[in-house]
Amino acid sequence: MSRQDVRQEIQRLIEEYQLVGELLTNLQAQHATVSELLEELTTALDGVRLLKGGAGERLVHIGAGLFVKGVFETKEVLTPLGAGYHAFLDLDNAERVLQERIEEYSRLKTSLEENIGKLAERAEQIRQVLERLGIR
Amino acid sequence: MAQIPPSLQDMVNRFNQAQAQLQSVLLRKQQYEAELKEVDKAISEIEKLSPDAKIFKNVGNFLVPQTRDAALQELKERKELLELHVKTLSRQETMLREQLDKLRDEINKELARLKGGEAAKGGG
């Protein structure tokens, strides 16, 4: 391999390393967003399940650690169906919709984690090769 | 380093341009497909509801009441439009991929020709 070939290969590896880094940053941002959404959906699901426990007094969080007493006799909740539409669904159906969405986002999260793992592995491989070639 | 002939430079420029176009087309197609999936989900949920169900549509910061039939009609129209967009973009994608394959072949042929010419010069 000529010196010029080595130089070109190093250049190619550096470019790939930068590209992999950008992709990783992008996927990690997506992962954070999906994790946040999952947390929100899980909280909502817990709320619906709590309401299914029947009517009665509940303590409701209104932010900053403040709670108020509330009496709930709800049979339906206004549920997002997607594409900007909402409908009043009974608690069982609201739970089903939330559960489906949680499953969907969980699959997405798993897939993102797999891709992040593969990219991180590739970045490490390139880093090691560049290090052996004396580039840090 | 030898100067790149203008004809080859032109091919490379066209290749890069087509590649950028393809990336843009794929991104738009992905966005429409995601929206289509969301619309499909909403349709399937609304179809499960009774005809007199209380449905609301998001309009800015407001939730506006709407009948089940009106919601379904609006969503189905939106679905048709999205499918049309996806179809159009898929056609563009196919054309651009063919264009890229053709340009790649032309560039490789030109490079091989140039290498052959250099080898002949070196041997002479």
Swiss-Prot record, chain A:
Name the gene: pfdA
Subcellular location, principal = cytoplasm
Q: What protein family does this chain belong to?
A: Belongs to the prefoldin subunit alpha family.
Q: Which domain of life is it from?
A: Archaea
GO annotation, biological process: protein folding
Assembly and partners are described as:
Heterohexamer of two alpha and four beta subunits.
Q: What is the name listed in the Swiss-Prot or TrEMBL entry for this protein?
A: Prefoldin subunit alpha
What compartments host this protein? Cytoplasm
Swiss-Prot record, chain B:
What UniProt keywords apply to this chain's record, in alphabetical order?
Chaperone, Cytoplasm
Organism equals Pyrobaculum arsenaticum (strain DSM 13514 / JCM 11321 / PZ6)
Name of the featured protein: Prefoldin subunit beta
In terms of CDD domains, this protein maps to: Prefoldin_beta_GimC
Keyword Disulfide bond in the entry? The reply is: no
UniProt cross-references to Gene3D superfamilies, sorted A to Z: 1.10.287.370
Cross-referenced InterPro entries = PFD_beta-like, PfdB, Prefoldin
Q: Does the keyword Chaperone apply?
A: yes
Q: How does it assemble?
A: Heterohexamer of two alpha and four beta subunits.
- Where does the secretion signal sit in this chain? none
Recorded family membership: Belongs to the prefoldin subunit beta family.
Question: What is one Gene Ontology biological process annotated in the Swiss-Prot or TrEMBL record?
Answer: chaperone-mediated protein complex assembly
Subcellular location, record wording: Cytoplasm
> Under the cellular component aspect of Gene Ontology, which terms does the record hold?
cytoplasm; prefoldin complex
One of the entry's Gene Ontology molecular-function terms is: unfolded protein binding
Q: Which Pfam families match?
A: Prefoldin_2
Report the principal subcellular site. Answer: cytoplasm
Q: What does this protein do?
A: Molecular chaperone capable of stabilizing a range of proteins. Seems to fulfill an ATP-independent, HSP70-like function in archaeal de novo protein folding.
